């Protein structure tokens, strides 16, 4: 059934109605569900999966807009396009939410057990976890929702299990006791990348250890240390000094007594001790500090863990047992002071590692964990980078990626949580055994049946299997995302064969370490391919004060509020127009009280402009047959027709090239300028003149060109503003609803129309018209007051061109007549009482006449001059202030000088005009 054009001509633009209509229709027609056997080169983006706990923020909206522009553009180019969506299970975030829910019931996860906890997690995921997906749909994402994935889906879990087994078989995964970043809040290990370093105003505590004689007696001599963590002295197993430090050479191999725990520890030498830190003598706590752990390994020191997993002190802490680590710190300081062992407290700015999730200081803790060896994996990716695999856009992010690969550590991949991919490892115990330690043997398998077979083969039949309780780091499964979503490990899956490697990854710079590098390493390891050809890194969304938008800063914006007010097309286009270049941050203003944004409102106004332009075209359309230009039409094109067709095809070339290069902001700006200025403000006005002309043939040509240009603009605009362009395209084309603009082809480039000389001539014409309009405003003329205008030039080519458009100039400038002549043919003394201007080879004069109220004009110019001179005085005072020149940012100082120059020019112009009026 065809849609009625009457609906468009009668109704105003209501974004919510248009957007809901087309989102439903795209879904019902399965518009974005490609078949791998379809024609067209493959193009694939697998979207960064937002956390299932998340709700839409402006960063998501920005990322979505960027991805969707590229996806829709490539689809219009005729590619076989897959954009695959999904969500991440977000282990720690979900576990935290459920633990809080249990706390309100007076329970914890241990009370209800793993099975019941996971039941609750899945129920929560089904009820609340899909919120962000429904929000993403509001933006108009052209993804294949039928292929939507979740990182805990059965098939993706199979991929994770297979990956773990392969890595273990390659001896890249191992189990060992190491210092890990422990988050007492979530009671889980976290990776280095989940640690946020924060500068904290703290203290450096100095205290001393009594020396012990060779006979074992406590001496009245001491060695002093300085530390930011005095509570860890309870786990000290040595003091260390630099072997080249003359102050301490005599103490090497002596012993000291650790306060409170009655432990004798040696004084050792280690070249890595910094002689200039504190006293030059350091306490060594191998179980609670990475540097101390390394010293302990080199010197065979005992490792004494004093910490429980919840951040309280354990039995090794003696009388401080069960105290929270920070409460214990206070008590230990107090007692050291009482014992006369505290010597000094210094204010000290310290960089403290915080858990990104738990928001508490990390505790380095000895723990048996699963690790993934990274050296060989990262090396293979570094080799690929030599061949620009992947290519980073902008290129500067390649160095960040490379530096991380160059300085990589083994990855702790186990987490002490229940929600996630359970590690596919089973501990092998005798039937009589019931406890697991770090020496318990284990097997890694794809399922329990395989595990039992492996264990029986290696250890005999009288055994029991207990599966490891831990889950894998969320980033482990996310690292497989580009290919597990396409069917891997089944490399014969049609989707995998068609769309892997992916074409491009679009993401923020903040997860280059977390995610991008891990995907490249996993992809190279399991598929021998880098998983995407290009990596487009976008910037942050900032507010009008250039501050990063975030919920914690209180300046975050809910995109749905702006979508409800202005429409998703307006929000998308606003964000994209703000992109100055790949990787650049963008700014978005927002009035929280009024729920308004001038940036988004401008894009909504642009949508209205397109809507009204289409109304105009349809109202004035007088035929329903083929709208294509025929040979006869081409011969009868007027200059304005040739000009708009030239501009249209130049636009096509520029925009398509820019989009291929991911220059989305530049593309958006060009489309805006053409549609608003060239088409709506100029060509539509030319067309109106023709519609008033009785020559029906010219009118028909103009109608055809209006439809052609507007249609091509709608197609090129479609990736940016998909809903309104789909609606208007259907109105223009009178197409059945089953035919979609989304699935059409990019406009054919017609180079024959490109004419640089016509472009130049029309540019001059528009400058002339703008000048005349400005002069009329300065004279205070009303639109109804028609005055003559004189255009004087000896440039024959220019004057001949202007003469062909004299009627248009007269109409556009509200002139009674337009006189075009050479300078020798007119006496310029006649223009003594005129306002004038010069553009290139052309002089423009508007003589005064009875319409001009000279006294009112003098008053207005005098007021303008007073204001300009006042501004000049203020600026002169500012730049005369040495303090301002020395301390203000350079761009502010430069701006002041530029404003002063402009002010002086304005003052000179106004004074000249006032002279004319005397």
From Swiss-Prot:
Keywords noted in UniProt: Aminoacyl-tRNA synthetase, ATP-binding, Coiled coil, Cytoplasm, Ligase, Nucleotide-binding, Protein biosynthesis
Coiled-coil blocks: 849-883
PROSITE patterns: AA_TRNA_LIGASE_I
Signal peptide location: none
Pfam families for the chain: Anticodon_1, tRNA-synt_1, Val_tRNA-synt_C
Organism domain of life: Bacteria
Its EC number(s): 6.1.1.9
Gene Ontology biological process terms in this record: valyl-tRNA aminoacylation
Family, similarity comment: Belongs to the class-I aminoacyl-tRNA synthetase family. ValS type 1 subfamily.
Quaternary context: Monomer.
Function noted in UniProt: Catalyzes the attachment of valine to tRNA(Val). As ValRS can inadvertently accommodate and process structurally similar amino acids such as threonine, to avoid such errors, it has a 'posttransfer' editing activity that hydrolyzes mischarged Thr-tRNA(Val) in a tRNA-dependent manner.
Protein name: Valine--tRNA ligase
Organism: Prochlorococcus marinus subsp. pastoris (strain CCMP1986 / NIES-2087 / MED4)
Protein encoded by which gene: valS
């Amino acid at each position: 059934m065809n849609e009625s054009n009457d609906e468009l001509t009668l109704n105003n633009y209501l974004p919510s109605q248009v957007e809901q209509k087309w989102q439903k229709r795209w879904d019902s027609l399965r518009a974005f569900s490609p078949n791998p056997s379809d024609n067209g080169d493959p193009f694939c983006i697998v979207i960064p999966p937002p956390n299932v706990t998340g709700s839409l923020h402006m960063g998501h909206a920005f990322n979505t807009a960027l991805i969707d522009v590229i996806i829709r553009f490539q689809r219009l180019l005729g590619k076989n396009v897959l954009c695959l969506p999904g969500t991440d299970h977000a282990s720690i975030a979900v576990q935290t939410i459920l633990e809080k829910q249990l706390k309100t019931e007076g329970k914890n996860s241990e009370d209800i057990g793993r099975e019941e906890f996971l039941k609750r997690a899945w129920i929560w995921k089904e009820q609340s976890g899909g919120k962000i997906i429904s929000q993403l749909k509001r933006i108009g994402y052209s993804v294949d929702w039928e292929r939507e994935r979740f990182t805990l889906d059965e098939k993706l879990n199979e991929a994770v299990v297979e990956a773990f087994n392969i890595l273990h078989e390659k001896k890249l995964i191992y189990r060992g006791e190491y210092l890990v970043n422990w988050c007492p809040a979530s009671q889980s290990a976290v990776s280095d990348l989940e640690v946020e370093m924060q500068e904290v105003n703290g203290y450096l505590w100095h205290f001393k250890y009594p020396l012990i004689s060779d006979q074992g007696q406590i001496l009245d001599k001491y060695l002093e240390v300085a530390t930011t963590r005095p509570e860890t002295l309870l786990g000290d197993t040595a003091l260390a000094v630099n072997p080249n430090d003359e102050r301490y050479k005599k103490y090497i191999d002596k012993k000291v007594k650790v306060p409170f725990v009655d432990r004798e520890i040696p004084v050792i030498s280690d070249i890595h001790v910094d002689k200039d830190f504190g006293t030059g003598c350091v306490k060594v706590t191998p179980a609670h500090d990475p540097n101390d752990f390394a010293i302990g390994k080199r010197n065979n020191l005992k490792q004494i863990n004093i910490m429980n997993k919840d951040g309280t002190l354990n039995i090794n802490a003696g009388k401080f047992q069960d105290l929270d680590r920070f409460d214990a710190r206070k008590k230990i300081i107090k007692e050291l002071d009482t014992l006369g062992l505290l010597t000094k407290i210094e204010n000290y700015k310290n960089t403290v590692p915080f858990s990104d999730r738990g928001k508490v200081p990390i505790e380095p803790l000895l723990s048996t964990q699963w690790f993934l060896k990274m050296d060989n994996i990262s090396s293979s990716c570094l080799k690929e980078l030599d061949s620009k695999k992947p290519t980073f856009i902008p290129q500067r992010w390649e160095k960040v990626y490379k530096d991380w690969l160059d300085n990589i550590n083994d990855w702790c991949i186990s987490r002490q949580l229940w929600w996630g991919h359970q590690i596919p490892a089973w501990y092998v115990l005798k039937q009589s055994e019931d406890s697991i330690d770090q020496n318990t043997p284990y097997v890694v398998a794809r399922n329990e049946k395989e595990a039992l077979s492996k264990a029986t083969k290696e250890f005999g039949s009288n055994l029991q299997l207990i599966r490891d309780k831990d889950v894998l780091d969320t980033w482990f499964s996310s690292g497989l995302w580009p290919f597990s979503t396409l069917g891997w490990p089944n490399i014969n899956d049609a989707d995998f064969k068609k769309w892997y490697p992916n074409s491009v990854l679009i993401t923020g710079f903040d997860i280059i370490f977390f995610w991008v590098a891990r995907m490249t390493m996993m992809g190279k390891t399991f598929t021998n391919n880098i998983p995407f050809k290009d990596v487009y890194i976008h910037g942050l969304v900032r507010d009008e004060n250039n501050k990063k938008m975030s919920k914690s800063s209180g300046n975050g914006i809910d995109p749905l509020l702006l979508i409800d007010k202005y429409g998703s097309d307006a929000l998308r286009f606003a964000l994209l127009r703000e992109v100055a270049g790949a990787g650049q941050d963008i700014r978005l203003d927002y009035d929280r009280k009024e729920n308004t944004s001038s940036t988004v409102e401008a894009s909504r106004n642009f949508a209205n402009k397109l809507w009204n332009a289409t109304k105009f075209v349809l109202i004035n359309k007088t035929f329903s047959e083929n709208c294509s230009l025929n040979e006869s039409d081409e011969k009868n094109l007027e200059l304005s027709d040739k000009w708009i067709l030239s501009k249209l095809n130049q636009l096509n070339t520029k925009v398509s090239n820019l989009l291929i290069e991911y220059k989305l902001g530049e593309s958006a700006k060009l489309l805006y300028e053409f549609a608003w200025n060239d088409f709506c403000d100029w060509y539509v006005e030319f067309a109106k003149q023709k519609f008033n002309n009785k020559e029906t043939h010219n009118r028909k040509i103009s109608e055809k060109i209006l439809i052609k240009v507007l249609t091509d603009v709608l197609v090129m605009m479609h990736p940016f503003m998909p809903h309104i362009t789909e609606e208007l395209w259907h109105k223009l084309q009178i197409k059945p609803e089953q035919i979609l603009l989304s699935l059409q082809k990019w406009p054919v480039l017609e180079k024959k129309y490109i004419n640089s000389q016509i472009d130049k001539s029309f540019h001059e014409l528009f400058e002339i018209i703008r000048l005349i309009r400005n002069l009329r405003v300065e004279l205070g003329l009303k639109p109804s007051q028609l005055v003559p205008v004189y255009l004087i030039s000896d440039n024959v080519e220019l004057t001949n061109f202007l003469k062909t458009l004299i009627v248009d100039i007269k109409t556009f400038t509200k002139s009674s007549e337009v006189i075009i002549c050479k300078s020798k043919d007119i006496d310029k003394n006649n223009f003594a009482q005129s306002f004038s201007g010069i553009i290139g080879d052309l002089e423009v004069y508007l003589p005064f006449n009875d319409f001009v109220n000279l006294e009112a004009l003098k008053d207005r110019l005098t007021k303008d001059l007073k204001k300009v001179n006042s501004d000049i005085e203020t600026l002169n005072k500012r730049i005369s202030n040495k303090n301002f020149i020395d301390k203000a940012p350079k761009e502010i100082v430069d701006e002041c000088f530029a404003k002063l120059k402009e002010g002086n020019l304005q003052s000179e112009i106004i004074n000249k005009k006032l002279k004319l009026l005397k």
